[in-house]
Amino acid sequence: MKRWWFNSMLFKKEFEHRCRLSKSMGSLGPIENASESKDPNRNDTDKNIQGWGGHDNYSNVDLFFGVKDIRNFFSDDTFLVKDSNGDSYSIYFDIENHIFEIANDHPFCSELESSFYRNSSDLNNGSKSKNPDHDRYMDDTQYTWNNHINSCIDSYLQYQICIDNYIVSGNDNSSNNNSSNENSSNENSSNENSSNENSSNDYISSSISSQSENSSQNEDITTSDQTIPESSTHMGVTQQYRHLWVQCENCYGLNYKKFFKSKMHLCEQCGYHLKMSSSDRIELLIDPGTWEPMDEDMVSLDPIEFHSEEEPYKNRIDSYQRNTGLTEAVQTGRGQLNGITVAIGVMDFQFMGGSMGSVVGEKITRLIEYATKEFLPLIIVCASGGARMQEGSVSLMQMAKISSALYDYQSNKKLFYVPILTSPTTGGVTASFGMLGDIIIAEPNAYIAFAGKRVIEQTLNKTVPEGSQAAEYLFQKGLFDLIVPRNPLKSVLSELFQLHTFFPLNQN
């Protein structure tokens, strides 16, 4: 936690506006730091209070204020302090009404002095009472009273100024240390000119400084919404600032979210292809102003009335619709790709993992039938975890239905179909239309499989080799034709379509 010197806080305008002083707030001289002392009782009886204005007679306050728990603070309290000249003053705190007053109320001070500092002169002169138990009681009383004053002052300053600095101080430890070192050097140079006043505040300075350091360490260990531990990884930072940054799944580097879309969701550090939403992919591939969606209002009716103990299926659908702005896990429609009219379907992994249910299967089937009727080239961007278990065998039937429509499109009409496999493409999508293309394209580092790694290992009790389900490894085995990064993808598709006699509409 950042350390604050008392004079620097008094110079802050926000502190001046929050506190109402009985004396005018003039300039304060430098606040000296002191070395460690062995006699806290003797030092505390000689605290110095500096004047608030040029005509006041208060002496210097040499306190190094730290940070403590505000729960230990009393909202309305009056304290007694005594300067090196023997003059007594009362300090009044009222945190509820924002009052901080210093008064020279001699009757009140005399009464408190008789109660708490009765034997202070005897202690300073080295004399002892005839009753040892009474001496120990007075020592304990004075020690407790001084600690109470320090605690309340610390807590008040924490409440007024430092309460909003948790995150900043947690992230700027190095700058805080430098600032603390500079303050210490300035205070030490000032102490050389005021060495006769240092001994009266050794205990308070060292005590509160220690408390501040302990508080700082505890805050670094505590995990909360406002405090970031020193040992936190990029993952923890990303969770807290995910509205600003996107973390790479490969190198764990942070990418500024504002520019992430313009970078095609590619990591700036390692070039890794991160997941894209269906809307971003449509914007990437389709010419502006040419997108015409199809079957947008088609939604699932829960065909097998699937119910879960955690959350009903219909409620989950409604939740994903609110979060993604989509009605289902695929968007279908027509548009132009570099002037070439195409039919395109784009799956969205953010909607229930891109799982294929009855609506997804029906929308893709209708898209294929439309492309067959209009003699259009077909693109389907795959991003799915497979068939949707909440719809049982109905979801499995979509594999056969889509494959049947593709057979008519490719074999009977001799039209051109290009699937684009992105990460992840698994399950029923891989086993059906994902691998039925005339030219199969995959993105770099895409995870492509029928059964996932965890399922295979649990079923066969064997370890799946690392990278055996990555696009580069599968390409060497001949599972698809091209691995194309996102940057040239649109140009590659345009060349393929023209090679298969699909030309732009405006071309003569």
Curated annotation (Swiss-Prot):
Q: Which reaction does it catalyse?
A: N(6)-carboxybiotinyl-L-lysyl-[protein] + acetyl-CoA = N(6)-biotinyl-L-lysyl-[protein] + malonyl-CoA
Q: What is its EC number?
A: 2.1.3.15
Coarse class of the primary localization is plastid
Q: Extract the Gene3D superfamilies matched here.
A: 2-enoyl-CoA Hydratase, Chain A, domain 1
Q: Which residues form the signal peptide?
A: none
The pathway that the record names for this protein is: Lipid metabolism; malonyl-CoA biosynthesis; malonyl-CoA from acetyl-CoA: step 1/1
Q: Where in the cell is it found?
A: Plastid, Chloroplast stroma
Give the start-end ranges of region Disordered: 30-51, 173-234
The record's note on quaternary structure and interaction partners says: Acetyl-CoA carboxylase is a heterohexamer composed of biotin carboxyl carrier protein, biotin carboxylase and 2 subunits each of ACCase subunit alpha and ACCase plastid-coded subunit beta (accD).
Purpose: Component of the acetyl coenzyme A carboxylase (ACC) complex. Biotin carboxylase (BC) catalyzes the carboxylation of biotin on its carrier protein (BCCP) and then the CO(2) group is transferred by the transcarboxylase to acetyl-CoA to form malonyl-CoA.
Q: Which family does it belong to?
A: Belongs to the AccD/PCCB family.
What protein am I looking at?
A: Acetyl-coenzyme A carboxylase carboxyl transferase subunit beta, chloroplastic
Task: Give the organism the record lists.
Answer: Lactuca sativa (Garden lettuce)
Which gene underlies this protein? accD
